[in-house]
Swiss-Prot record:
Catalyzes the condensation of isopentenyl diphosphate (IPP) with allylic pyrophosphates generating different type of terpenoids. The lineage of its organism: Bacteria, Bacillati, Bacillota, Bacilli, Lactobacillales. Mg(2+) binds at residues 35, 226. Keywords: Magnesium, Metal-binding, Transferase. It comes from Enterococcus faecalis (strain ATCC 700802 / V583). Substrate binds at residues 36-40, 48, 52, 80-82, 84, 86, 207, 213-215. This is Isoprenyl transferase. Belongs to the UPP synthase family. One of its GO terms (biological process) is polyprenol biosynthetic process. It is an enzyme of class 2 (transferase).
Amino acid sequence: MLRFFPQKNKYVEEASQYAFDKEGQIPQHIAIIMDGNGRWAQNRRLPRIAGHKEGMDTVKKITKHASHLGVKVLTLYAFSTENWKRPTDEVNFLMQLPVDFFDTFVPELIKENVKVNVMGYQEFLPSHTQDAVKRAIEQTKDNTGMVLNFALNYGARAELLTAMKQIAAEVSEKAYTADEITEETIADHLMTGFLPTELRDPELLIRTSGEERISNFLLWQIAYSELFFTKALWPDFSGDTLETAIASFQNRNRRFGGLKETTETEGSDPQ
């Protein structure tokens, strides 16, 4: 029988050379660039908004899975400052998504003890989106578990520019001198500044859909993050894919510019 709307097979992550160790080190802060909703829909000859809706369901699944694994902060790149360039109908749908997401998922977040935060330029969001964000933050403010941190109308260059302007104003007001500015000063003024110092920078950054670029996301904070790229489109991203990424992280030697813990041999890479 002819199929006019063929369904592409669900993406299956290639077998990892590493096994996930649930007793091993779990990244305290994981950031994800959720990419591929539109392509997922197009592969199925569906409108792009169908991919965004499916992607919202993936957010729910991954949020709970990450929380159960012991992740402390999950930062999700939901809408960039550049995404306003997309077709109006798609942008309008994306602005409604947080409303639908929080209205249906906040009760589960409360049950899971997950706390919601949203970083970005919220003042430019439609009023109904702002209201949904405020409600979710208020309803989960007393939760003490994982922080679900959405980057909504966020761009790292704009974030850095805003921080520099705030610091310049404080120097002008003689709160401190230019010579007293430190990396911590800058970090305090970034949108992740609400987090404890040890949780501000993601240990692991994941990007879906096979693209291998950062797309103006957390440029300051990911200086020493481990990067993991998967071909899985975001709606196909699963708990198993998350564990594959963490397994890769668990088998990396994070040196932060220093030497490996094992004895270095002459002629080895000094980087």
